[in-house]
Amino acid sequence: EKKYIQIFDGYRGAYGVANIKNAYVDPDSGKLKLKPGDYRWNYEELKDNIYNEHLNGTKSIGIQPCNEEGETKFGLIDIDPANYEHFDKKFIIDKIQEYKLPLIPILSKSKGLHLYIFMRKFVDAAILKSFLSNLLPLFKLKSDTEIFPKQTQLTKDLERGGYRPGQFINLPYFNKTERRA
């Protein structure tokens, strides 16, 4: 659990909450969707016990990978295909292996793929995001494919204090078994 927390470290001033129990499958796209209010920021400090609740299956959480200094320890390409039924995961995995890319594919909650890259220490978020962006053509992905961290610099939140967290990414291994690599 300590290793998991070290790997998925980022902005700790707030964390995302995803109420997976109320999720439904969109009949048109096949994507798992959440109802309004079931996918939101919780403006409390992200402490180690919250990570443990995620791993134990009590609370599904997400994190903003970019910290207050504009650095990150991980990033990812979020592949949400137009048609999940005919999505060729093997093509993506074959490209990772062919080019010996430091990416780990993990199933997303909607059965797409998150292609993670992990760093030993915090690195400039803009540089990591640029690296991931440059990989999109290799995987035949559109230039508007989601890449996290979405924000490479957090801005001050004058109303709440602290920082505006931007967008979070749901963390894998909810209940220690779901969405494995």
Annotated model-derived regions:
Residues G62, K100, K156:
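Sparse, context-dependent recognition of short Cys/His-centered cofactor- or disulfide-binding micro-motifs
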Residues E85-E98, F118-E146, T177-A181:
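Helical (often loop-to-helix) elements that flank the catalytic cores of nucleotide-handling enzymes
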Residues D28, K111, T177-A181:
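Short acidic (Asp/Glu) and glycine-rich catalytic loops that position anionic groups and cofactors
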Residues I63-C66, L103-S110, E146-K150:
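Short beta-strand
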Residues E1-F74, A82-I92, P149, Q167-F168, ...:
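DNA replication initiation on ssDNA origins
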Residues L76-I77, I96, P102-F131, G162-F174:
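Histidine-centered divalent-metal-coordination microenvironment in nucleic-acid enzymes
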Residues K142-A181:
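Catalytic "initiation/cleavage/transfer" segments centered on a nucleophilic residue
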